[in-house]
């Protein structure tokens, strides 16, 4: 009923969810249970719909797409809670160090902001590009799922999960919140550039890093991780998993080339964050490939065993 790679995804969700509940209870954090329950029910409902298509409609493409997507939705939910449960940070922030590393590479974020404040139309275009990350992933899921590329679909989802867990782990020991907590850009320049991440965002990140969280709600979740950049991971996933689609790959590549200045400018990322995101993607993608191969072998072995038991 549930394939091995689907079971893997859902097991990770359950384990991480149990850790979340333990940490919430231990820290006494108040929670918007209704808000999280709504998203959780959407995920569970999608799984049930996937099982309906598998068992009743006998449609493997739709069922795999729905179940794996539901697993990823639920993982995003429990993963964001886990990230917040690591607050306040327990190690020194390394943003100043990354600024010095960026300087060695010739990168200076305030100069980038100033450059685009003088070109507001281009900055507005990059802002649109910046917010295409999630829609791009949705399109990739639909393309892979509904064209029957189940191995690539599983590889895609497990890559995202592994990259997220690796990013959270790195951030827990090397916390960063991006350039906006280091540089105070004058309001007139920031307004001209139309930054997606403003000074109030940076102020809230600093507060959370010092005080932690006392109330969790999906309505006010912030992106906590600066290094490595998960926006970079998502961009790399979009390019990698559509590269075999000849008519689409150059469009996706062009869009995500623009994503680089977009995430630096509007995501308030260090250049080091971007490079770190590429490394995390490469490691997660390779590890996920091995995991999918192992899980596929397990699925094949299970199928053979079922056939053997069915023989007279």
Predicted regions and their residues:
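N-terminal transmembrane-helix/juxtamembrane module of multi-pass inner/ER membrane proteins
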Residues: 2-41, 67-139
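Aromatic-anchored segments of alpha-helical transmembrane domains
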Residues: 15-24, 75-77, 164-172, 256-267
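Interfacial segments of alpha-helical transmembrane regions
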Residues: 64-72, 138-175, 179-190
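Membrane-interface loop-to-helix entry segments
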Residues: 122-136, 222-241, 271, 275
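Membrane-interfacial catalytic/cofactor-binding modules of polytopic membrane enzymes
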Residues: 173-244
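Interfacial helix-loop-helix junctions of multi-pass membrane proteins
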Residues: 178-181, 226, 257-283
